Amino acid sequence: MSLLPRATPAAMGVSSRAIDALLDRLEENIEPHSVMIVRHGHVIAEGWWAPYTADRPHLLYSLTKSFTSVAVGLAIADGLLRLDDRIVDVLPGRVPPDVSAQGHRLTVHHLLSMTAGHPQDSLTEAWELEPDDLVKGFLRVPFTTPEGTRHTYDNATTYVLARMVEKVTGRDLPGLLDERLFAPMGIGHAEWDRVASGAAFGFHGLHLTTEAVAAFGELLLRDGVRQGRQLIPADWIELATRRHADTRHGDDWANNPDSLCGYGYQFWMSRHGYRGNGAFGQQCVVAPSQDLVVAVTAAATVEDSMPGALWDCLLPGIGRPDPAGDDQRLADRLKRLSLPPVTGDAGPGRSATAKIDASQDAALPEGTVITVDPMPGGGWRLRLGESVTVEAGHGGWRESAPLGRPVVTTAAWRGDLFVADLYVITTPHRVRLTVDAGTGRASAVWSTVPLTGPILERHLRAPLMTRPDVA
């Protein structure tokens, strides 16, 4: 069942040629996986680059933070949490004995706005200090600026928020959002990556379909009301999507003018509205002045490619609809979107064996034995060590789920080289596997290295679970 109604671009006053230009820009600058454009509450353009599909949830990375913000807003609306509540009061059992005076003062507001006072993202150091409890680790990392004075993008702040919400509501974060947000929206497929205790990261790890992301943006645009029901408090949306911190000092964002517009409560401000933003190009962009929502999933290595492409390509087409023939040409293009399968030959029809010569951030450990066997009727069976076996198609893709999560693979021979692309299809990431039948050497290299580590086997398990931690 669709979450949003459909219409043509012209019917909603948008140029299909402008959307066409946006598709061109995305394909030139990033590896796009999906796009959905919503105007006046109607989907006017939607497409998935094969092998990605409409029904497949996609890892959102830090776009997850915007959903955690909603959970905080629900807890506040229920009277269970306040913006000035302190970490030490809500989670007293997770406060280290040597917590600093500044750590004592940190509140929900400081966490939401990422103005706790750490000089940089504290996540890695916090986990090194307290491998079993990130909350304690976060409070032990030294603060270098007074709270509330400087924004530093800090993943651990959102983790602490998630634990605070769980403490005051008595619900785990996924369960709370399933009941209060996703189920009323008609979303039943949300999946969360977790730490080893089973707790959701909160700052990343949510998987949703592109339409679910777009429907979330549309819900924000409608002040939290869906089908006459108030799912998110309107005053929370207004507060969360307002600037609370200046980001103009952030050198990391210097190439992206939208990232200099400020930070709200787990939302980025933008030149024409606001957005939820995730690594490698996961985007939910809301432009209230244009009654517009755009959802994108991708494997982007150029982080400044979005949302600038929307403003450059799409905004000039607002209020300038094109003839019906142009709408149809766009619809035809959207149906044919595809990433390129591996090119090369279907033969020779022989097996090959090689061992991984691992580089830094390789997807498979050094010495992993790779076996390539032709299959009756075409394609290949690939054995990657002892625990992972997948099938690969020629000129297309074949799907396998060796450890729970699907991987979709395309391959071909290029002389003595066997080349395969393994798409971890619920994420932005793929692995380029190369087997040299002549030398017996192989490599497995990520197109973009997952932020949760390079080992492929980990990303094929559902749910992905990393890091020790207490519940």
Per-segment meaning from a language model:
Residues G278-S338:
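Structured C-terminal helix/loop/strand segments within mature extracytoplasmic catalytic/sensor domains
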Residues A324-A471:
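Peripheral terminal and inter-domain segments
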Residues E238-V294:
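Active-site Gly/Thr loop motif
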Residues G117, D121-T152, T158-R194:
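A small/polar active-site loop signature that marks catalytic segments
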Residues T157-M164, H204-V225, Q282-A299:
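Active-site-proximal alpha-helical segments within enzyme catalytic domains
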Residues L59, D78-A116, R140, V168-H204, ...:
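Active-site helix/loop module of the DD-peptidase/beta-lactamase fold
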Residues A18-T53, D291-A295:
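A short, well-structured edge-of-sheet supersecondary motif
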Residues G41, H58-D84, L111, L161-V165, ...:
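Active-site SXXK
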